[in-house]
């Protein structure tokens, strides 16, 4: 029993249960052989006894466990790594609906999951739980997808025509809607908790500041605050940081390493100053490790590419002794940055 428990404690595939059964079978054969030495008259009898009883005791429980595991998970309300892998399948009904109704939110969730999984691995947290939780953290946005900027490609922002208080109420409501959808799709509690905790009790600061600028009457911060609770685990705290950083990184005109590092420092400092991490077991060492991991991941994501010229351009360059490929690539990179900066200014204006 001890051998089997140790062998499957970190199982993330159903085949791991079969592998564990082989270890149990081998140990059982050895134990049965030792105890049967005094009762068996021949080696053949000893071998048959050890292989049969040892194998029966090792392989049969594995077959039973493989079939009973889904039933036991539901009855005991335990979420195993195997179940987390199933929840991370893009064909899961909730994720499939999210992709169809809010594709921008879906892609954001995928990116947050990548960042969170790497960060969790860096500090020894549950990386599979981080990935699965990140997939579902914005599930409530599919009810009104056009109210969230990542789904507004090529369309007007409806918040431009709404009072800030109403905009804040709509945006904040995706938490409650997400919790309702988590119940609808019968998501485990370990996954559902990512929905409220990834925003904690933060302020919807954009709409709060907008309301203060527009309204002559007093504006109360509590009307613009997420309901919480604050992150209660390392995993939900990691997703909170990754969520804010990933969204903000898309606004950088030049997402180079220095700008990304400054952005990460600013956002994480804001989360700490707002006391959002007070109720989770993350240490300052963990937080610094998470920041370093996110920086590595984002730097890789926003890497530069060489701009390969087409055949006509190549012909012209050959005739006029054009600059080498590295020089052309550098120029192309700067052009891309300048274009991005110009587009960002146009959007701001």
Question: Where on the chain are the PLM-derived regions?
Answer:
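Divalent metal-dependent catalytic cores for phosphoryl transfer on phosphate-bearing substrates
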Residues: 95-257, 261-264, 270-274
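Cytosolic regulatory/linker segments at or just downstream of nucleotide-handling modules
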Residues: 274-299
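Non-transmembrane, amphipathic alpha-helical segments
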Residues: 47, 56, 60, 64, ...
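Conserved helix-loop functional segments at active or binding sites
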Residues: 5-9, 36, 40, 117-122, ...
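A glycine-rich phosphate-binding loop feature that marks nucleotide/adenosyl-phosphate handling sites
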Residues: 19-26, 48-54, 129-139, 195-202, ...
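Catalytic or ion-coupling anion/metal-binding cores of large enzyme and transporter domains
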Residues: 46, 204, 270-273, 282, ...
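Generic detector of multi-pass transmembrane helix bundles and their immediately adjacent loops
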Residues: 1-98, 103
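Long, low-complexity, intrinsically disordered segments
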Residues: 325-349
């Amino acid at each position: 029993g001890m051998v089997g428990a140790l062998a499957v404690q970190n199982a993330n595939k159903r085949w791991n249960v079969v592998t564990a059964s082989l270890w149990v079978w081998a140990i059982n054969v050895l134990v049965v052989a030792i105890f049967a030495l005094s009762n068996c008259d021949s080696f053949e009898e000893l071998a048959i006894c050890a292989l049969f009883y040892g194998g029966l005791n090792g392989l049969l429980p594995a077959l039973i466990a493989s079939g009973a595991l889904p039933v036991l998970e539901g009855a005991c309300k335990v979420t195993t790594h195997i179940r987390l892998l199933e929840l991370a399948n893009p064909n899961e009904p909730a994720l499939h609906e999210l992709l169809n109704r809010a594709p921008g939110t879906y892609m954001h969730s995928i990116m947050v999951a990548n960042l969170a999984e790497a960060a969790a691995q860096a500090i020894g947290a549950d990386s599979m739980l981080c990935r699965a939780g990140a997939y579902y953290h914005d599930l409530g946005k599919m009810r009104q997808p056009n109210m969230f900027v990542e789904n507004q490609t090529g369309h007007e922002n409806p918040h431009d025509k709404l009072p800030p208080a109403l905009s804040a109420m709509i945006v904040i409501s995706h938490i409650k809607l997400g919790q309702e959808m988590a119940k609808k799709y019968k998501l485990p509690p370990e996954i559902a908790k990512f929905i409220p905790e990834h925003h904690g009790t933060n302020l919807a600061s954009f709409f709060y500041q907008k309301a203060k600028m527009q309204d002559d009457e007093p504006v109360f911060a509590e009307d613009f605050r997420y309901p919480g609770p604050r992150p209660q685990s390392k995993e939900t705290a990691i997703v909170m940081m990754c969520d804010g950083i990933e969204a903000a990184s898309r606004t950088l005109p030049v997402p180079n390493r220095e700008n990304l590092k400054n952005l990460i420092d600013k956002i994480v400092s804001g989360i700490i100053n707002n006391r959002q991490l007070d109720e989770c077991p993350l240490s300052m060492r963990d937080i610094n490790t998470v920041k370093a991991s996110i920086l590595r991941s984002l730097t890789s994501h926003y890497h530069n590419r060489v701009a390969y010229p087409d055949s006509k351009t190549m012909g012209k360059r050959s005739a006029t002794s054009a600059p080498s490929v590295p020089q052309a690539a550098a120029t192309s990179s700067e052009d891309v940055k300048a274009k991005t900066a110009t587009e960002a200014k146009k959007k701001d204006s």
